[in-house]
Structure formats: structure tokens, C-alpha cells
Amino acid sequence: MGVRGLQGFVGSTCPHICTVVNFKELAEHHRSKYPGCTPTIVVDAMCCLRYWYTPESWICGGQWREYFSALRDFVKTFTAAGIKLIFFFDGMVEQDKRDEWVKRRLKNNREISRIFHYIKSHKEQPGRNMFFIPSGLAVFTRFALKTLGQETLCSLQEADYEVASYGLQHNCLGILGEDTDYLIYDTCPYFSISELCLESLDTVMLCREKLCESLGLCVADLPLLACLLGNDIIPEGMFESFRYKCLSSYTSVKENFDKKGNIILAVSDHISKVLYLYQGEKKLEEILPLGPNKALFYKGMASYLLPGQKSPWFFQKPKGVITLDKQVISTSSDAESREEVPMCSDAESRQEVPMCTGPESRREVPVYTDSEPRQEVPMCSDPEPRQEVPTCTGPESRREVPMCSDPEPRQEVPMCTGPEARQEVPMYTDSEPRQEVPMYTDSEPRQEVPMYTGSEPRQEVPMYTGPESRQEVPMYTGPESRQEVLIRTDPESRQEIMCTGHESKQEVPICTDPISKQEDSMCTHAEINQKLPVATDFEFKLEALMCTNPEIKQEDPTNVGPEVKQQVTMVSDTEILKVARTHHVQAESYLVYNIMSSGEIECSNTLEDELDQALPSQAFIYRPIRQRVYSLLLEDCQDVTSTCLAVKEWFVYPGNPLRHPDLVRPLQMTIPGGTPSLKILWLNQEPEIQVRRLDTLLACFNLSSSREELQAVESPFQALCCLLIYLFVQVDTLCLEDLHAFIAQALCLQGKSTSQLVNLQPDYINPRAVQLGSLLVRGLTTLVLVNSACGFPWKTSDFMPWNVFDGKLFHQKYLQSEKGYAVEVLLEQNRSRLTKFHNLKAVVCKACMKENRRITGRAHWGSHHAGRWGRQGSSYHRTGSGYSRSSQGQPWRDQGPGSRQYEHDQWRRY
């Protein structure tokens, strides 16, 4: 994670940038400096999972009671010190970082293979050096923290950007995590979670200002350094030859430096002594070997610019950024500019604006001086104060607006000047809504074309003016142009929405009504909380008016910014999308918003033995459930399309090279009374709707016929029974002994304290039990998905693992059951548990019999169970799917047009 080699460099070459600090003292200082303001730490939760998971056992599926207790202690310690914690989780994987995500998943696969090899050889858990976090840890940590009353947020993009942005905008005490990217962002202080001593609240602060002093750079140069070294966006090998050229020049005058540390020092030296000379005179691609990677490089640099920040290394057009607090922020990232650092002139005095010089950079940076308040606004400040955007103040609104210059023609781009200036501003003003619209100048015909920017100026869209109505209609970029174009804006969720052309698979734009009675500004300052125009039905009707024009000149690929990715919206209902987005941001759902917005989801590694052909991967087992959920969530989309939609699944399973996502189609389901709409499931508060929610949930598991039996089961075992029925119907190699172990551990868990679970030690580690434990936990995460998609018919606490599963306890029961121990022994001679055990077992077995699945012990297995999963002739999707394992093979291998075609072999593991 983070910048390649920077963590090691800091530890070996620049240890002085690490300072031991105490959170209690920092909090006290913060309170005295900002009275009435609670000291707040933004926590990058994904970086902290390894630190938080303190239980000794991790191989058996997770010690969830112990883990929950550790989280509670963590929260209590900071609360006692008067420190508020805000937890951020990754809500999605950005496309720019997909390759890095895949690389890590494949690396994890190799680690898992070594883990299972060790287990089979030693029959014990490997040492902590082979530690692998239990499956579902990130998902359930969100719910654990919410249960503990903590503010928990799920990101709409990569979490590190939102963490850094939140910390800067809310004047936080600092960021707690373990990612060197936080040394690159110009934000609040960065503290290490790995160095945290919870008892004393001591940790290490990594100071980016001291890092800059050591490297001879200023904070604004760090994104350039990070991209030249390699990060999650820029592959490490992209500039390898360039780095070694820098190293050759550097080592010729320096001696006795280690190679790795030398590279970072050498690249920094090249930036400060060579690149500085050309700054403002040449573009980066003229002084760096960017080649075909120019767009990616600029995108990597722009990804570090927080709302309101600019880079002195390239000039940017303002782009709208949506943060979790629904604030629309202006950032910019025009890489095609001349990189001239603009000078602002006082409109009255015509004086040139003074320059400010950073302490280490030895270069001048312009500032703009407002004629009235005489307040200097630096473009690039020294490392201590925060970096600001040069702004002009409009004569009426007194609102600060970032300035920009047109890079190609020598024509001034729309600027606003001081109140005394009598300078004409090249702005297009709609006389009715008083909406300022910047003009777009085509460099070839030299003809001015009005541009539509909307309230979130992410991307300029050429406007077509009708000859009669004089109404501006947004132009549609055809499928050949391969250009992503901004479409409608969700009025309340502040999210930009895209829809997909079903044949071209291109993103089709829809714009807000251009004659809306609302003001659309060209750009906004970071502190302006600008409201978006309210969307109307007319926006959708504009689709029919949009004309295809493949001739439209594409915007330069270097015009990128750290905004939320423009998404292919699978669902067009903005009200439902708003609800889904809210649940997503508040960490109340799992995958639902990803499915509805982008139609793309992922699932990380699971402890699965790739050599065990008898147990299928959890990705396959739970796929039919996900397909039915897709049918529910995307029903609105399917009504208006002639071709069936497909969701892109990046699920890790043995043998999957992850070169492409699996294209998975929705699977229709039969629900008593018909499939209810999402508005009914999510928004209708009538008591009778709860029955329909439960019917829908059971239909997702294809268990509508077992509704009465499941309703008779008491909490919290209802959800567990539903999951066990599904598992045993789907996987024929699960036997009666497995069922006994699953039920026994759930019952015994209810009477165990955390200390009892800590002291529990299985006789040895069985690789099959390891995989079964992970399989059940992945089933619980699937329950989170289904429950949230259906409007929460069940209490979330009923299927939280700390209430129904413990890894070591399950392992113990599995080993006992495998050896043929009596049920009374499994239940620890507790008679009350015995009655519940037989009731739960009866419910599962009866439901399975309805699906023609008889659960037997291992002694009754025939030869067809050896090394294969599934019974010949049984339907994988069971009732109502039309697929059969014996006749059709695995149905997900043929997903129709546009999907990858797979070999027609029902047992082939990719």
C-alpha cells in the first residue's frame, strides 16, 4: 500500500521524521487551541484490521467474540481520553487501482496455498508470520463499530482520499492508519496504528514537513515524487529506467548510500535541481519520459489533490468532487495547460502580484492580492500551512472562484475580476436563470460553443442549441468516441449518475434541465457548500432529444481529477439510489449500492484449499443468491431493456486469474404475491410489508417452501438455519457430522464467556474444517447483502458472527463429530441445548428433503462423493432456474453475448 519504498526509506534513512507523541497530550493541546471543539481522529479502518485482530487463533474462521471485545477496549480507551473517532472503510475499488487489487489478491492466493500446505504437514496453525485475516473481517468490523456507537462511514471511492479530505476539512487531530500515501496528501498529521500502545496512547507521528526538509522539496512536490516512485495507480516498473538514471547522476557525487534509500534521494534531487528549472516553461511530458503513460501519470498526481488544492506542476480545470458530507468541492486537473503559474493583477492598480517563496523549494510561487481586503492567497504554500487555490472574488457574489487559463489558444478562459475592473468576462449568461456558462473555444474552427457545466463542474459537455426553441440540449457522445460524459445529478445524494447504452455499452449522458431556475457556478471554493439543481422528469425525456455526434472532439485524457468515478448507473430511480447510497455511506448495507450504481462488485480472498475438489468455492456456492438479489435490485433496469443485464463480479476463487470479471446475469425468482418493488420494500412502513420483506429474503435463498418451519425457530438461530439449509441443499459433500458441528457450536456459544473461548484449544487443525468455517462466515456476509436488499426483515444482530459462530469452538465440535462422539458430548451434557439441537436439526433436514436432499453420515456415502461436489442429476439452482448440473454444466460459465465463454465442463475449476 502507498508509495513504493517510502516506508522503508523513512525507517532507515529518515528516522527523524518519526516522532513519538501521546494522544492524551495532543488532545489536551487541541482543546486549549480550539475551545468547544472535540479532538477527532479519522481512522483508516482497513489499515487497522491487523492491529485490531488480537486473538491468537485466526485459522478456524475467526474468534469473533474476542475480536468484538478487543474493538470495545480500543473504543473505550480513546473515549476515556476525550477523543472522538471517525472510522472509514473502503466502499469500492477504483478502476485505476484494479490492477493493484488483482496483484494483491493473487499474492494472497499463494499465501493461502502455503497455509494449507503447512496445516496438512503440521496439523496446527502457522505462526503469526503467515497470519491471514479471517474472511469477512472488514464487513463485520463495520457492524461491530456501529454496535459500539461509533460513527462509521463507507467510502464512495478509495477510502484514503476521503480520509485525508475529511481530516483536512474538519480540522481533525490527525489520521490513524498505516499507509504512506498519508505522507503525500497535504492534510492533517498522520499517526501510525502499528506503533500505537493502547495502554498509554503513545504512537509515532510521521511528519511530512520534516520529510520535505530531508528531500529538499515542498509538500506540493510530494505527489510528483510518489508517482515517479510508483504507487497504487502508477506501476512501480513504469519509471524504473528513469529512476536508475537519476541514481547514476546522484551517486556520482554522493558516496556511501544504500541503493534503495539512494533512489528516493536521487529522484528528489532530480526534482529539486533539474525539474524546478523548467517548471512553468515546459510541460511535464517534455521533461519526463511519460510516453504513452501521460494520462495515467497525471491522474496519479491528481489523485493526491484534496478539495481546493492545486498542483504547481500542472494547471487544472475545476472538477466537482463529492465528499461524504455531501459537499460539492472544486478541484482541478488540467494537465494540458502550459503549466505557467498565472499572475493575477490587481484590477485597480494594475500591479503585479507578489510572489511567495517556499523555504526549501527555492522557487517563487504567485499569490493573488484582492484589491479590497488585501489578503494574500498563496497558490503553493510552504509545508506548514495548507495549500490553497488562487482565487478571484466576483463583484456581486463575493464568492471566490479559482482562475484558469486556456492552455492551447492564447485566449483567456472565463475569469472574474475585482469590482473595480471593467474587463469583459468571456462568460455565457443565460438570461432567464442567470446561469453563468463558460464558453468553449474550438481550436480549429475558432467558433465559440456554449458549454454546459451543471452545478458540479466535473466535465464540460457541449450544448446543442435548437434553431426554434432556443433551448440548449446536451450533446451525446456516440459509442465510437469511447468518451465518458457527465449525466444527471442526483439532487439530494449529491451523486452523479450515469446510464448505459445496452448495445454500445457506453455511458450515455443525461443533463439537468438547462433552463432550471437555479444558479450553476463555474467552480466553487472548497468551503462553499453549493446545492445541486433538483432533478426533474424532464431530464429523462431529454434522452430522446440527444443527438449522436461522433465528431465531437474528446477532452484531453490528462484532464483528470480526484473526483468520484463517473459510474454506469444500473438503476435510474434517483429516490431509490439515494436510499441505497445513504445505507452504503452509513455502513448499514453491503454491496447493494455497488450493484445498483456501477454494476460491479468484488470479494477478496477466502481460506479455501485449491486442492480440495470436494468442496466448491464460496464464490460459486453463494452465486445463485447474488443472482436473485441482482434480479431484485435491477428489476427496474430489466423492464426497459431488451437484453439481460450482467453484473461484473471480481470474486477470488482457486484458479481464477482475475484477468476479467465474471459476467453474472440476474436470476428470476418466484415470490408469493409477486416481486415487490424496492420502494415497497425500503420505503413502505406498513406492518404487513414486513411479511413481504421476509418472503423476498427467503425467495433469494430459494427457500419459500420452508417459511413456516423457519418462522418457528427462535432468534438468533433463524438466520443460521436458513443459511445451513441453503448450504446443505447446494453442496452434496456436506454430511450429517458437519450439520451436527455447525448446530452444536452455535448452541454452546450462547453460554460461553469471552475468557472461556480464549482458553479453548482444539486438539489439532483439520484443513476441511478450516474451509468450512470460512464458508459459513462468507454465508453470513451474504446474509448481510440479502437482508439489506430486502429492506431488513431480520435484525442484523441475528447473523453477526459474535452471536452465532466461533472458529475454535466450531473446530472442536467438528473434530468431535468426525470421531463419532454422541450429540450429548457435543452439547457438553446440557439437556436444554439437546432439545434445541433436535429442533434445529429437524428444521434443516425437513427443508432439505423438500428439495430432494437427504443428509446422511459419512458411513453412507457412495463412491460419487469422493473428490466431487454435487449429486449427479440435481439442479444447481434447484427450483425454477432451468439449469441442471448434469445436463447444463455450471450455469455461470455461459453468460451470453459479451461474456467470456468457458469450457463446458461441470467439474472444471477455472
From Swiss-Prot:
Biased composition (Polar residues): 872-890
Keyword field contains Ribonucleoprotein: no
Compositional bias segments (type: Basic and acidic residues): 335-351, 360-375, 396-411, 901-910
Top-rank lineage group of the source organism: Eukaryota
Subcellular location(s) of the protein: Nucleus
GO biological process terms held by the UniProt record: fat cell differentiation; peroxisome proliferator activated receptor signaling pathway
Residue positions, PTM Omega-N-methylarginine: 885
Chain intervals for the UniProt region annotation (Disordered): 333-416, 443-483, 863-910
Tissue expr: Widely expressed.
Cellular component GO terms, alphabetical: nucleus
Keywords: Activator, Differentiation, Methylation, Nucleus, Transcription, Transcription regulation
Gene3D superfamilies recorded: 5'-nuclease
Purpose of the protein: Functions as a transactivator of PPARG and ESR1. Functions in adipogenesis through PPARG activation.
PANTHER family for the chain: CONSTITUTIVE COACTIVATOR OF PEROXISOME PROLIFERATOR-ACTIVATED RECEPTOR GAMMA
Assembly notes: Interacts with ESR1 and RXRA. Interacts with PPARG; in a ligand-independent manner.
Family to which this protein belongs: Belongs to the constitutive coactivator of PPAR-gamma family.
Designated name of the protein: Constitutive coactivator of peroxisome proliferator-activated receptor gamma
UniProt lineage: Eukaryota, Metazoa, Chordata, Craniata, Vertebrata
